[in-house]
Amino acid sequence: MQAFTAHTGLAVAIDSANVDTDQIIPKQFLSKVTRDGFGVHLFHDWRYLDDAGDKPNPDFELNQPRYKGASILLAQENFGCGSSREHAPWALADFGFRVIIAPTFADIFYGNSINNGLLPVKLTSVQVQQLMDEVAAKEGAQITVDLQALTVTSPSGSVFDFTIVESARHKLLNGLDAIGLTLSFEQQISDYETHIPAWFA
């Protein structure tokens, strides 16, 4: 998993609350079990005017030229609600997003994002709206998210503090998924196993 320390990138806003995982990645695209290849189906029902995905919807933000290459997504309350499918953060990451900023997230989506190297940042509704307004006002507007300093810097230079559980921060800073985190304690595990009584082995 790629480590995350700080990221500056083009931002795009989806100004809707309660965006659920079926909107993020519809169920008909969940047959794969590997993490790659889901980006093309991200927000499928909004991005395309047809079921085959051949006719892009020109009104949807991700299809607009000014947001091409966006790596920071701004959203409203309760982002990632609905079913617990891990494919949702897979699709967002495969599309190129590194950070999702919203006032609140669904708990399971929040955890799945961290486990897959995608940073979910909680800011107040007022702060998120300011970011959305600034991004809409200036083409090419970029936001900086610093996980070491726990700050978000808006296009105009406003700085917002955010919090994240230290264990999650540690995993992201060091690029550790659940398996990688376990392996980081390999020596301690080995030491423990050499000292436990044989009948526990």
From Swiss-Prot:
Gene3D superfamilies given in the database record: Aconitase, domain 4 (3.20.19.10)
EC number: 4.2.1.33
GO cellular component: 3-isopropylmalate dehydratase complex
EC class name: lyase
Assembly and interaction partners: Heterodimer of LeuC and LeuD.
Similarity field: Belongs to the LeuD family. LeuD type 1 subfamily.
Function field: Catalyzes the isomerization between 2-isopropylmalate and 3-isopropylmalate, via the formation of 2-isopropylmaleate.
The protein's name in its UniProt record: 3-isopropylmalate dehydratase small subunit
Lineage of producing organism: Bacteria, Pseudomonadati, Pseudomonadota, Gammaproteobacteria, Alteromonadales
